[in-house]
Each structure stands twice: as C-alpha cells, then as structure tokens.
C-alpha cells in the first residue's frame, strides 16, 4: 500500500495503465530482492556496529576519498553476489531439477501408454458384408481371422495341421514367385529356387480331391489313405497275396 500511495497522480495521468502496472511490478520485485539480500546478510556480533556504521568510523578526509568509496562498493557487491548465489543454489538445486524432469518423463510415458491401451481396446472390429461366409465355421457375421474356432496365432505354420501329405500352394514373399507342390506337409516349408529362403504354404488341400475336402476338418479321412481300387480304408487290392 505504501508503494501504491507513493505513486504521483501526475505520473498516473501521464503513463498508460499497462505501463503503470509494469512499473509497480518492477518496484515490488526490487523490494523482494532487497529483502532477500538482507536475509542472507550475516549478523554482526554482539556489541559491534553495523558494517555501514563501522565503515563510517573514520576521519572525514578518509570518508570522502575515492579509495574508500570504491572499497565500500566492492564490499556491497560481494555481499550481494554471495546472497544471490546462495539463494539461487538453495532454490534451484541441480538434483532437484533432474528429479523433476525424470518424474515428468515417467508420468508422460504412463499417460501415453494408457492412451495406447485404451485406443486399442476401444477399436471396434470391422463387420464383413452381409453375404460374407466364414470358411472355417461356415457362419456369417465375422471374418475368418476373427472366427472363434480359429487356431491361436503361432500354433501352426501351415493351414493344415494333420499328419498326411497334401497339395500346397506357395508364394515367395521376396520375389513374389508362385508354385505348387504335391509334397506338402504340416509345419514344413519349401525353399524358393530363386531367393533360397524357406517358404511355408498359404493354402493346402488333399492330393486326390483338390476342391472337395475341407482341410480344417481333421475328423475326415483323406482319400490318399483309401484303397486305390475299391476305395475302402485299410485294404490294398493291388498288394500281391
């Protein structure tokens, strides 16, 4: 209030409101810094005069000398520098700032991980067209990758998981070359003759019935295990008696 009352009415009429507020803020800041410097100034011993009075005890010709005034200025600047450095190091410790930065980074990481989890959890599954039929369970309403009867990812490397030999279709992911083979087995690949990498079949079906038997149904017997003459399982007519 004393600072506000000290403002001259003529100055208030000359300065703009923004300039006036800036001047008041700078005055308060200077007062706060001066009080902070006084707080860090060491107290004199009992019975001793203050530094200003102690420096004033001298002959008049010494007090008015430029050497004495420069000495006083250097002492005051030294005290102000010590107070400022101590307040700066006390208020802003490097360890405290590093800890604050680490805490902020950890909180940001947790926040972004929560956002990622929530976005993945809230992502709705795309519905197929009305005429789409799942070729695994033969039901509508979902894609084959979302079928509840599908094998867990990573359980098998090939579509067929039985113990029979079947017909497989291959496509090299590097050179995009396609080929077919009648010597395809479960969880076994073939080497691309051009890139020399192992390629697993993306489609497998029985040998003698390419378009009939569903490879996902493991309960059926494959035709290659039937008799070639009478088509009866467990008997081979061409075997010499």
UniProtKB/Swiss-Prot annotation:
Q: Does this entry carry the keyword Metal-binding?
A: yes
GO molecular function per UniProt: nucleic acid binding; zinc ion binding
Q: Would I find Zinc-finger among this entry's keywords?
A: yes
Positions of CCHC-type zinc fingers: 132-149
Keywords from the UniProt entry = Metal-binding, Phosphoprotein, Zinc, Zinc-finger
Q: Name one Pfam family in it.
A: zf-CCHC_2
What top-level branch of life does the organism fall under? Eukaryota
> Residues bearing Phosphoserine?
65, 93
Q: Which SUPFAM superfamilies match?
A: Retrovirus zinc finger-like domains
Q: What is this protein called?
A: Zinc finger CCHC domain-containing protein 24
Native species: Mus musculus (Mouse)
Q: What is the lineage of its organism?
A: Eukaryota, Metazoa, Chordata, Craniata, Vertebrata
Tell me what gene encodes this: Zcchc24
């Amino acid at each position: 209030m004393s600072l506000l009352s000290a403002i001259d009415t003529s100055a208030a009429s000359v300065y703009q409101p923004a300039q006036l507020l800036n001047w008041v803020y700078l005055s308060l800041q200077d007062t706060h810094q001066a009080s902070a410097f006084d707080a860090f100034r060491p107290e004199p011993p009992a019975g001793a005069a203050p530094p200003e009075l102690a420096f004033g005890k001298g002959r008049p010709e010494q007090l008015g000398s430029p050497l004495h005034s420069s000495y006083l200025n250097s002492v005051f600047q030294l005290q102000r520098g010590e107070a400022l450095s101590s307040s700066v190091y006390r208020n802003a410790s490097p360890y405290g700032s590093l800890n604050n930065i680490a805490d902020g980074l950890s909180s940001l990481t947790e926040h972004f991980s929560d956002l990622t989890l929530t976005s993945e959890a809230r992502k709705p599954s795309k519905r197929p067209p009305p005429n789409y039929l799942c070729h695994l369970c033969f039901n509508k309403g979902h894609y084959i990758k979302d079928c509840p009867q599908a094998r867990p990812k990573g359980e098998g490397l090939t579509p067929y998981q039985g113990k029979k030999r079947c017909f497989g279709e291959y496509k090299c992911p590097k050179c995009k070359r396609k080929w077919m083979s009648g010597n395809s087995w479960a969880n076994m690949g073939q080497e691309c003759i051009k890139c020399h990498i192992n390629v697993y079949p993306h489609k497998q079906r029985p040998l003698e019935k390419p378009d009939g038997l569903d490879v996902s149904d493991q309960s059926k017997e494959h035709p290659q295990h039937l008799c070639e003459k009478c088509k009866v399982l467990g008997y081979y007519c061409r075997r010499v008696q």
